[in-house]
Amino acid sequence: MNGDHMVLGSSVTDQKAIILVIILLLLCLVAIAGNGFITAALGVEWVLRGTLLPCDKLLVSLRASRFCLQWVVMGKTIYVLLYPTAFPYNPVLQFLAFQWDFLNAATLWFSSWLSVFYCVKIATFTHPVFLWLKHKLSEWVPWMFFSSVGLSSFTTILFFIGNHSIYQNYLRNHLQPWNVTGNSIWSYCEKFYLFPVKMITWTMPTAVFFICMILLITSLGRHMEKALLTTSGFREPSVQAHVKALLALLSLAMLFISYFLSLVLSAAGIFPPLDFKFWVGESVIYLCAGVHPIILLFSNRRLRAVLERCRSSRCRTP
């Protein structure tokens, strides 16, 4: 559920909307299962070996934050269905929005730093700065982690200040929950404070992510062209590996675009609250969140091997 931009006051009675709500909850369960599996697999490896690869530390941080985010989304969705006329900035929804804002920002930053790591480590650019980064980047992973937590905490506090100001104004003026949209303080805070802050804080990690994705896809594309010149065609294992990597990167980039655009449209109030279009937007957001770990499971050799071991152990269990 997108942060705090929701004005309640009408129940979900549209049959299509109810179906979308059910789909949204199922997508959350899929995302919880996928992210939970990846977090558990990498967490067990971390405990057994006492260490993880730098990129896996970022990956497990990303998956853990997404895992928690899906639970918050489910909790907020259920609360909205049970109390459709509740004031959108009441303490319960502020508490859920606080968690959602932090976890959403954390997933965006962890995704951006992970794309930086993969870009620097995998891309084959020969610029001196790029080569220098290859040797230094692994040492910066702790800084990436703490910067993600710090930036997410800072932006969450900014969101909380805006949400709490609206709630205090509501208490002072004895407004009705359904009339909050007509209040000038609410309108001013949403348009000139919350929305700009969201755009800035969401766009920064998204821009980093896409710059790195473009560089990485460009590098892999050039490498694949060279491989095609020295091999007999697409059936060669090396070429197929490049094709699979490119397809995985493109699919992840498309999912990230869909996620980001849906967040922006929802924050801008394009989707009417609790209407069919609103739930369409929410479903798109969490469809991306649900598909992403599945792609990762089948594109990562180590995670795929863990999944196969789990399947084989279940088959042997009487």
UniProtKB/Swiss-Prot annotation:
Principal subcellular localization: membrane
Coiled coil spans: none
Other known facts: Most taste cells may be activated by a limited number of bitter compounds; individual taste cells can discriminate among bitter stimuli.
Membrane topology: Multi-pass membrane protein
CDD domains registered for this protein in UniProt: 7tm_TAS2R41-like
Compartmental location: Membrane
GO CC terms: membrane; plasma membrane
Protein name: Taste receptor type 2 member 60
Source organism of this protein record: Macaca mulatta (Rhesus macaque)
SUPFAM superfamilies reported for this sequence: Family A G protein-coupled receptor-like
PANTHER family, A to Z: TASTE RECEPTOR TYPE 2, TASTE RECEPTOR TYPE 2 MEMBER 60
Record has Transit peptide as a keyword: no
Keywords associated with the record: G-protein coupled receptor, Glycoprotein, Membrane, Receptor, Sensory transduction, Taste, Transducer, Transmembrane, Transmembrane helix
